[in-house]
Amino acid sequence: MWKLKIAEGNKNDPYLYSTNNFVGRQTWEFDPDYVASPGELEEVEQVRRQFWDNRYQVKPSGDLLWRMQFLREKNFRQTIPQVKVGDDEAVTYEAATTTLRRAVHFFSALQASDGHWPAENSGPLFFLPPLVMCVYITGHLDTVFPAEHRKEILRYIYCHQNEDGGWGLHIEGHSTMFCTTLSYICMRILGEGPDGGVNNACARGRKWILDHGSVTAIPSWGKTWLSILGVYEWIGSNPMPPEFWILPSFLPMHPAKMWCYCRMVYMPMSYLYGKRFVGPITPLILQLREELYGQPYNEINWRKTRRVCAKEDIYYPHPLIQDLLWDSLYVLTEPLLTRWPFNKLREKALQTTMKHIHYEDENSRYITIGCVEKVLCMLVCWVEDPNGDYFRKHLARIPDYIWVAEDGMKMQSFGSQEWDTGFSIQALLDSDLTHEIGPTLMKGHDFIKKSQVKDNPSGDFKSMYRHISKGSWTFSDQDHGWQVSDCTAEGLKCCLIFSTMPEEIVGKKIKPERLYDSVNVLLSLQRKNGGLSAWEPAGAQEWLELLNPTEFFADIVIEHEYVECTSSAIQALVLFKKLYPGHRKKEIDNFITNAVRYLEDTQMPDGSWYGNWGVCFTYGSWFALGGLAAAGKTYYNCAAVRKAVEFLLKSQMDDGGWGESYLSCPKKVYVPLEGNRSNLVHTGWALMGLIHSEQAERDPTPLHRAAKLLINSQMEDGDFPQQEISGVFMKNCMLHYAAYRNIYPLWALAEYRRRVPLPSLGT
């Protein structure tokens, strides 16, 4: 039986360590000795069958396995009767209150013992296969993924195969060469034959690959991983010279000027490229060489495949200047750097690159910055020393990335513990039900306090291209270590709100000095245009995006400013200024003024804002309206608010909700869901955005219609149904935030009940 473990380390593993006793850590274990009742087993099998039967209709999982576990362990039973509001009935205060209480009690029961809310954070289908390939190469496949793990990984692959036989970049996407190839190889490594798998998964996948040009058309990241595995040749890849890491810092393309994720992906990739590392050529690798190409492997002209990419994978076509750069490196530079005496320079570059990798590993407790980087850095450590401590420390942190749901085992981006908990706490606080959920709030407060990053990265962190992190919050847990501006702002907001509440209910307030550290992080990340970046100060030259080496992402080379980060920071600093009016007053005032200007300047012509981390214009507009409202901007004194209200009202569906397709993100224009369906998460965002604009004072009818949809959509136990995917990154790849379906309908109903006048049955 699969069990989710919370905040657990391993006293018997000397390679596993933590900065705060593993608070926020979430790991899955299969317990073969657990004696499950027939009812438990049937419940698990039932939700698996239901997902499989509906896999083409609702592609994100409901994240049900741990929910069933927690509700069973806490003996939760929904005792508050469900309410429905008829078409010709008005929403009453009692109906809103009852629905809200049901949602609050259900969601509180899902809180973990350390105070956070666990949730799946995955969706891209290129996360897990490289991990399987890595442990296969290093000889650790059986220990990392024993039989029950393999079974669940295969379940996940089968569940998310498209009807045409391929796999998308993410679970809702059209089939791509990249993820179809990775999924096929993963199935073969895990023991499926060339024609094996449920519903002929392997044969259908291989047919899709060969019908679309064979693996020679895989994009650059795929070429890299296949070269590492031994089913492609390095000579067919664009150069990734490690010499970038010893360039003079004044050059515009120096790694210090790169976006941290780009830097952290190409750091280990460049090491592996510089070494031309290839894993052991096993019988399976030789079979894959035969299966994945439309011609004999030894007859392929690898030089001609370097620029080939399947049209299904191309989101960002490479400009001519980039092709010229890679050609120059390929033809002129690489032949020199592999020969004496220039190979001495390469050796120095590899040593410098390795130094940076070890630094990043140590400062993240071997979690690294994310799952793509994790696997690459782990492999590099094995290449350096297969029996070394660095690699063993990486192995110890693999469980931090693994997640199990009714659709199988997947790899998380790295966990959204702090992000989800910050919003969960604010939603619960807005419910005005403190007297009913005091212990929940106290535990959540404790988690947030314990998760704050207490120190900057070690040593001379600026020479390692790192920014300050002391006082920040990460996306996941403290061990991760990477500061994020909006996570910091949301954590700061929670601590500020808790500081105004009785300590006997919510626990001791955080020390002011730690709040000052958070403010310092936020102030350090604002650019001259008023916008706030996410991880590190933005400021590199925009033309560097022309050198984006990926084909399926956009805006990945340098750090940018984001509407959501800017808005979160405005809201946090406005509240901080109210409670601590004497601290850096002038700087905070200037920050807010410039940030508001940024929001106004980045509004789209239709009145919306592009959301960088959620779908899409609905998400961005909710954030922007929240920031503008906090800064004192209203419908009557701000044209941007009026335009945003017009956009939201115009996009409201006939049933009272909002529903936006994920296609809005890559297309950068508003696209409604197919069939004009509503999505409850999107409805929550839009409803809160309109409430921020004080729509209730002008015409509350749109708010009542949206609230009625939320009330009538609540399930029997107080949950809300899982619908379409809601998160995104880098314009073109979707991310499943499983907690969103609880947080945002609940939060929207809380705001609605608190701020919109409602009739009462007693009057």
Curated annotation (Swiss-Prot):
The EC number of this protein is: 5.4.99.39
What tissues has this protein been observed in? Mostly expressed in roots, and, to a lower extent, in stems and leaves.
- The record's principal subcellular location, in a coarse class, is endoplasmic reticulum
Where do the PFTB repeats lie? Answer: 100-142, 150-191, 441-485, 515-560, 592-632, 641-682, 703-744
**What general EC class does the enzyme of this chain belong to?**
isomerase
What protein does this entry describe?
A: Beta-amyrin synthase 1
* Assembly and binders: Monomer.
Which cell locations does it reside in?
A: Endoplasmic reticulum membrane
Task: Please report the record's description of how this protein sits within the membrane.
Answer: Peripheral membrane protein
Active-site residues annotated for this sequence: 486 (proton donor)
The positions annotated as site (Transition state stabilizer) read: 419, 475, 613
A single GO cellular-component term on record: endoplasmic reticulum membrane
Q: Recite the UniProt keywords alphabetically.
A: Endoplasmic reticulum, Isomerase, Isoprene biosynthesis, Membrane, Repeat
- Protein family membership: Belongs to the terpene cyclase/mutase family.
One family name in Pfam for this protein: SQHop_cyclase_N
Which gene is transcribed and translated to give this protein?
A: OSCPNY1
Q: Which domain of life is it from?
A: Eukaryota
Q: Name one GO molecular function term.
A: beta-amyrin synthase activity
What does the UniProt record say this protein does? Component of the oleanane-type triterpene saponins biosynthetic pathway. Oxidosqualene cyclase converting oxidosqualene into beta-amyrin, generating five rings and eight asymmetric centers in a single transformation.
A GO BP entry: response to nitric oxide
The cross-references to CDD domains, in alphabetical order and at most eight, read:
SQCY_1
